[in-house]
Amino acid sequence: MFPMVTGFMNYGQQTVRAARYIGQSFMTTLSHVNRLPVTIQYPYEKLITSERFRGRIHFEFDKCIACEVCVRVCPIDLPVVDWELETNIRKKRLLNYSIDFGICIFCGNCVEYCPTNCLSMTEEYELSTYNRHELNYNQIALGRLPMSVIDDYTIRTILNSPQSLIKMVKPPLIKD
């Protein structure tokens, strides 16, 4: 008779434990009901990136001294630097500089260690193309600065959207 009583007690304890777990998960779900949605309508609304965001690399051709520090610090030896030595002035002359963003891991080492600060990170993150060879940017494409999200008149940022966060929190008043 005792095994049957202990079996009923174990069954009761397991039932209470299962009900408690279900109740905890239900309370978690209810606590998230009042939160605002995080989803944005991507092509029409964009988030403003932070100052430390690592987007596409910007390159200034006139500042580069062809020292190849960017190639040495890159974990995948990505930047391609073509230069020639001018013997009359005993300096390197930069011929071509390119980065393939299909391979780049956006670590920022090239920007950090560049002695002349000719490399910088921009806030551009839309690099999608239909052909992977279009992601190989030369010095001309790297020199173009992207349009800032804040200055782009075709994009509504989250801060300027007509449904601001304060309006979304307040429920509409219904008068009878």
Curated annotation (Swiss-Prot):
Annotated binding of [4Fe-4S] cluster 1, by residue: C64, C67, C70, C114
Binding site for [4Fe-4S] cluster 2: C74, C104, C107, C110
Catalytic activity: a plastoquinone + NADH + (n+1) H(+)(in) = a plastoquinol + NAD(+) + n H(+)(out); a plastoquinone + NADPH + (n+1) H(+)(in) = a plastoquinol + NADP(+) + n H(+)(out)
Annotated 4Fe-4S ferredoxin-type domain residues: 55-84, 95-124
Cofactor: [4Fe-4S] cluster
Cofactor note: Binds 2 [4Fe-4S] clusters per subunit.
Compartments where found: Plastid, Chloroplast thylakoid membrane
GO BP annotations listed: photosynthesis, light reaction
EC number: 7.1.1.-
GO MF, any single term: 4 iron, 4 sulfur cluster binding
GO cellular component, one term: chloroplast thylakoid membrane
Membrane topology: Peripheral membrane protein
Quaternary structure, from the entry: NDH is composed of at least 16 different subunits, 5 of which are encoded in the nucleus.
Similarity comment: Belongs to the complex I 23 kDa subunit family.
Record function comment: NDH shuttles electrons from NAD(P)H:plastoquinone, via FMN and iron-sulfur (Fe-S) centers, to quinones in the photosynthetic chain and possibly in a chloroplast respiratory chain. The immediate electron acceptor for the enzyme in this species is believed to be plastoquinone. Couples the redox reaction to proton translocation, and thus conserves the redox energy in a proton gradient.
The protein's name in its UniProt record: NAD(P)H-quinone oxidoreductase subunit I, chloroplastic
Provenance organism: Populus trichocarpa
